[in-house]
Curated annotation (Swiss-Prot):
It comes from Homo sapiens (Human). It is found in: Cytoplasm, Cytosol; Endoplasmic reticulum; Early endosome. InterPro entries: WASH_strumpellin. The gene is WASHC5. This is WASH complex subunit 5. Acts as a component of the WASH core complex that functions as a nucleation-promoting factor (NPF) at the surface of endosomes, where it recruits and activates the Arp2/3 complex to induce actin polymerization, playing a key role in the fission of tubules that serve as transport intermediates during endosome sorting. May be involved in axonal outgrowth. Involved in cellular localization of ADRB2. Involved in cellular trafficking of BLOC-1 complex cargos such as ATP7A and VAMP7. The modification Phosphoserine is found at S917. One of its GO terms (cellular component) is early endosome membrane.
Length: 1159
């Protein structure tokens, strides 16, 4: 009959593909369960209030039109719904595809069973497949994996969350319109079961059997699979466990399968007493906590509580005397085997001869160790015992007492067993690889000894007192030939013949009285020794390695091992060289990967890489978690060193009086520093002893592990320092900003110095790591803060700054800001608020409008540079950009609402437009016309002024940041600054040349050069924030005249001061001139330049008309508003760096030249 798993066996390949797919689906479900967007849980009140109206469970399907009409009625809900869709559609689709694949899996399995019944596969029926060893295994696994999938989904992804995700996918995707979509079936299968994985939650009735029956499966198939599992040893595991007391461990995998599959036929659990007795007697006579898949544990006492037959059958196992007997037995066994293992692990004990002579003894010891570890770990696990269940608690307490359970001793046994196993495996692999070479070597040596003896008895080679003996000579030559004729490939015959040859050599020594000659005896003894070695060597079989692999399975502890983490870390802290022993434990744990990967590998599935990457990644993350204690301990020592260096140790001057030498020696503190530094070196040594290890398919380099660990600890501490250091009290007078920045600067400097100090002792690039990680922390926090302003947010798993191995911690927000960078930015905006302060441009300083005290100055930005570095300033700049964009967008919507929808305002603007046309003319009776228009539009200017001033304020801050960045760049990196400036000029020259002659080259749209250079230029402060286009705009009617009216409406609130320029007239009606000018300038910059032209023309016309009206008076005096308008034009020209003729096109130059002299 054709091999069932052969590539040309369609029947075997079809079921193998299904099972392979099942293992891949479970890995995907486990992977996705870590990425459930928190919003779908609707746990906190804020989420419920915000998203409660757009996230629905299956009640949505009762009347989708009703829900959608509610959404359509509120534009703000529609907007939120669209934003939610954009942010979550990718992850929701991924979840939906996983759910769909679960449904497809069971549909495929049902179709395969139908095909078997209908005879699609020639000569194959369900019965014949179950008779085949591989077929039987695969059919049992196929049903079992489906059950595991359902249990994993319910455990890891709550029912309500599943429903909300499915409804969201239905609403946001094209699934509803797709005719071939099986959305309905998926929803029926995965609707909420009412199960909750929270401790103490009540189990729903008929759970999980009703859940398992949502998709009908062929009943005869289920009962045949249960029959096979009850009667057969389907994986032939018993041969690896010959002792009867190990029987339940040998059948543990099969027991887990049977446990899951019984839920497909719950009548057995409920009423079939005899069957349940048989199952319990065979699989659970001495155990009741089982691992069902990759460490997911189940306690049968709890799981079988609702089923009468199952519960009754289990009572024998749970009898107090049996529990006591098992616990005492495993306590005794673990003590005995631990002593044995420690003996085996003594240096020089496990030699090749000893191992080869004692294979059964060593394997028995390994079996006992692993069985004891398994039983004790499972039955004492917290996860398997619900603290609210009195009976479970009693059983567990009984076990802890009778087994004299000590987690440290159990962990030590696990460590030693893993180390013993590892050494044995390595020795066996080495012996197997050298097996043939050694055997041939021994054969050659033995044969040569016989030839030499033959020569001795021929009389040719004289040997003291050995007479010539032709018979012996011929006999020894024959023996030599016989030894040479032994064939390695026919090991059985060779072994038998070798034993005969050894007997013959013993007999010849006796019959021919050869004992009298010591040299002949020595030759014979050597040959016998070589023949013995040949027998030993030929007996080195791969079966031993296979048995060790089966016996050493640690997949049941995939999750339980986490409960030993604190013990592992404490052991490492006390003795860093412990890491070498842990390496063997991690490798033992890695063998758990064989379980899900075996079928995927057999099926040559492309999923092999992603599944093995997932499980290997999980294990490597665990290794990192355990070893993180080393960087943590290093940093603890490091902080002590820094404290000693900064507070206790006095710096030695370059010249020193001899008698003061003792004062500066400070032997105590220096010894303390040396001791702590030595401790850091010991920790480094500990982790580097681990050697490069392949964990699953991921290569773990201890040096990289150490560096990542140091980075992780640094990130954790720096992020916390930044979070804690930048929390402000908005009511504090004066502001806490500068003192807090100085304090944080000192903390950051301490970290920086400590890193410089440590780098040589742990062999890392301290400065490089410091800069990379601090920049990552700041950039990530800026990204999170900017998410507030983005419709499509950057999720953690999409962020280029966030990392799984070296995560940046997130802290609960303490105010409206999400992160410390937002708090810093808002505090700066608060203290430089144009309503409270007055900015003096020449001094780069802000003063309080009422008290005239200095509030802050450009020193603030050099302090931020010192504390947060270039990244901090650059991040602040980026955040301000987002805020300006938001402010400008708000402004535009306000413009639409207040101006373009107000009839009165429009009529006023129309009248004014007619009065001032053409713009080059002088307006007659100008005062009346202008002030009448201002009076009619008075109500709109308050909101207008606030928006303009906010934008202006942020632009001033951006200018200050650019100045600071540019100054420090020229100072610290003059070559970079020069290179960037030259490249920028060259690019601009090329672009200008292209516009004059389009045949010349120009960067295409797909060329990223301009984007990349912009990022560099902004980081180096080589840019002008006033020239930036923040938003795209459409044409707006009345825009220039509205801005003109706005400006002249503000002029009466200001007055000219010869020393300071334009200042606020009354603090009660606050207006600050620089933010006003820069805000207007920025706003106009967003629109077509013709709007600016019209705006400037209107100001020019206002100046000329007002001056014309003044000159008709007896004593002509230049009005204050005209002075303000002229100063605006002057500042406009200065800020935009345009030639003065731009202003002179609208105002005669003599007015510009002379107006200051008149004042």
């Amino acid at each position: 009959m054709l091999d069932f798993l052969a590539e040309n066996n369609l029947c075997g390949q079809a079921i193998l593909r299904i099972v392979s797919c099942g293992n891949a689906i479970i890995a995907e479900l486990l992977r996705l369960s870590e990425f459930i967007p928190a919003v779908f849980r609707l746990k906190d009140r804020a989420d419920q209030q915000k998203y409660g109206d757009i996230i629905f469970d299956f009640s949505y399907f009762k009347g989708p039109e009703l829900w959608e009409s509610k959404l359509d009625a509120k534009p703000e809900l529609q907007d939120l719904d669209e934003e939610f869709r954009e942010n979550n559609i990718e992850i929701v689709t991924r979840f939906y595809l996983a759910f769909q694949s679960v449904h497809k899996y069971i549909v495929d399995l049902n179709r395969y069973l139908d095909d078997l019944n209908e005879g699609v596969y020639i000569q194959q029926t369900l019965e014949t497949v179950l008779l085949n060893e591989d077929g039987k295994q695969l059919l049992c696994e196929a049903l079992y994996l489906y059950g595991v999938m359902l249990l994993v989904i319910d455990q890891k992804i709550e029912g309500e969350v599943r429903e909300r995700m499915l409804v969201s996918y239905y609403r946001y995707s094209a699934a509803r319109s797709s005719a071939d979509s099986n959305m309905d079936d998926i929803c029926k299968l995965l609707r909420s079961t009412g199960y909750s994985s929270q401790p103490g939650a009540k189990r729903p009735s008929n759970y999980p059997e009703s859940y398992f029956q949502r998709v009908p499966i062929n009943e005869s198939f289920i009962s045949m699979v249960i029959g096979r599992l009850r009667s057969d040893d389907i994986y032939n595991q018993v041969s690896a466990y010959p002792l009867p007391e190990h029987r339940s461990t040998a059948l543990a995998n099969q027991a887990a399968m049977l446990y899951v599959i019984l839920y497909f036929e719950p009548s057995i659990l409920h009423t079939h007493q005899a069957k349940m007795r048989e199952i319990v007697d065979k699989y659970f006579p001495d155990n009741w906590v089982i691992s069902i898949y990759m460490g997911i544990t189940v306690n049968l006492v709890d799981a079988w509580e609702p089923y009468k037959a199952a519960k009754t059958a289990l009572n024998n196992t749970l009898d107090l005397s049996n529990v006591r007997e098992q616990a005492s037995r495993y306590a005794t066994v673990s003590e005995r085997v631990h002593a044995q293992v420690q003996q085996f692990l003594k240096e020089g004990y496990l030699r090749e001869e000893m191992v080869l002579d004692n294979i059964p003894k060593l394997l028995n010891c390994l079996r006992d160790c692993n069985v004891a570890i398994r039983w004790l770990m499972l039955h004492t696990a917290d996860s398997a015992c619900d603290p609210n269940n009195k009976r479970l608690r009693q059983i567990k307490d009984q076990i802890l007492t009778d087994s004299r359970y000590n987690p440290r001793i159990l962990f030590q046994l696990l460590l030693d067993t893993a180390q013993f196993e590892f050494i044995l495996k390595e020795m066996f692999k080495q012996m197997l690889s050298e097996k043939q070479t050694k055997w041939e070597h021994y054969k050659k040596e033995g044969s040569e000894r016989m030839t030499e003896l033959a020569d001795v008895f021929s009389g040719v080679k004289p040997l003291t007192r050995v007479e010539k003996n032709e018979n012996l000579q011929a006999w020894f030559r024959e023996i030599s030939k016989q030894i040479l004729s032994l064939n390695y490939d026919d090991s059985t015959a060779a072994g038998r013949k070798t034993v005969q040859l050894i007997q013959a050599l013993e007999e010849v020594q006796e019959f021919h009285q050869l004992e009298s000659n010591l040299q002949v005896c020595q030759f014979l003894a050597d040959t016998r020794k070589f023949l013995h070695q040949m027998i030993r060597t030929i007996n080195i079989k791969e079966e031993v390695l296979i048995t060790m692999q089966i016996v050493g399975d640690l997949s049941f502890a995939w999750q339980l091992i986490d409960s030993f983490t604190s013990i592992m870390q404490e052991s490492i802290r006390v003795n860093p060289s412990m890491v070498t022993k842990l390496r063997a434990t991690f490798l033992k744990l890695a063998s758990a990967l064989d379980l899900p990967l075996l079928r995927i590998n057999q099926a040559n599935s492309p999923d092999l890489l992603s599944v093995s990457q997932y499980y290997s990644g999980e294990l490597v993350s665990y290794v990192r978690k355990v070893l993180q204690i080393i960087p943590e301990s290093m940093f603890t020592s490091l902080l002590k060193i820094i404290k000693l260096q900064t507070h206790d140790i006095i710096e030695v001057p370059t010249r020193l009086d001899k008698d003061k030498l003792r004062d500066y020696a400070q032997l105590g503190p220096r010894y303390e520093v040396a001791k702590l530094t030595h401790a850091i070196s010991i920790f480094t040594e500990g982790i580097l002893m681990m050697k490069t290890t392949l964990v699953g398919i991921i290569k773990v380099d201890p040096k990289q592990l150490l560096e990542d660990g140091i980075r992780k600890e640094l990130v954790k501490r720096v992020a916390f320092a930044l979070h804690r250091g930048l929390i402000f009290n908005p009511r504090a007078k004066p502001s806490e900003l500068m003192p807090k920045l100085k304090e944080l600067g000192a903390t950051m400097d301490g970290f920086h110095r400590s890193f410089e100090y440590i780098q040589d002792y742990v062999n890392i690039y301290g400065l490089k790591i410091w800069q990379e990680e601090v920049s990552r922390i700041i950039n990530y926090n800026v990204e999170q803060e900017c998410n507030n302003f983005l419709r499509t947010k950057i999720q953690d798993w999409q962020s280029m700054y966030q990392s799984t191995h070296i995560p940046i911690p997130k802290f609960t927000p303490v105010d409206e800001s999400v992160t410390f960078i937002g708090r810093l930015c808002r505090e700066i905006l608060r203290i430089t608020d144009p309503k409270m302060t007055c900015h003096i441009d020449q001094l780069n300083t802000w003063y309080d409008m009422k008290t005239h005290q200095e509030v802050t100055s450009s020193r603030l930005f050099s302090e931020i540079q010192t504390t947060l570095g270039t990244f901090g300033l650059n991040g602040l700049d980026r955040l301000l950009c987002f805020m300006i964009v938001k402010e400008l967008q708000n402004f535009l919507s306000m413009f639409q609402k207040i101006i373009l929808r107000d009839r009165t305002v429009q009529d006023t603007l129309k009248t004014l437009m007619n009065a001032v046309s053409p713009l080059k003319s002088i307006v007659a009776n100008s005062n009346k016309i202008y002030f009448s228009a201002i009076a009619k539009t008075q109500k709109i200017w308050t909101a207008y002024l606030e928006a303009i001033m906010k934008v202006g304020q942020m632009q001033i801050l951006r200018q200050q940041i650019a100045n600071e960045l540019n100054y420090s760049c020229r100072f610290d990196s003059k070559h970079l600054a020069a290179a960037l400036e030259n490249l920028n000029k060259a690019l601009l020259a090329d672009i200008e040349a292209h516009y004059q002659d389009p045949s010349l080259p120009y960067p295409k749209e797909d060329n990223t050069l301009l984007y990349e250079i912009t990022a560099y230029l902004e980081a180096a402060g080589i840019h002008n924030p006033l020239n930036k286009i923040y938003i795209t705009t459409k044409r707006l009617p009345y825009f220039p005249i509205v801005n003109f009216l706005f400006l002249i409406a503000q002029l009466p609130k200001l007055q000219y001061n010869k020393n300071l320029g334009m200042v606020c007239r009354k603090p009660t009606d606050p207006v600050d001139w620089p933010p006003l000018v820069l805000g207007l300038l920025t706003l106009l910059k967003q629109f077509h330049s013709r709007y600016t032209e019209q705006f400037l023309a209107l100001i020019g016309q206002f100046i000329c008309s007002t001056v014309e009206q003044c000159t008709s008076q007896k004593i002509p005096e230049i009005p204050a508003d005209v002075v303000g308008a002229l100063l605006f034009l002057e500042d406009y020209v200065r800020y935009t760096k345009l030639p003065r003729r731009v202003a002179e096109a609208h105002v005669p130059n003599f007015i510009f030249d002379e107006f200051r002299t008149v004042l």
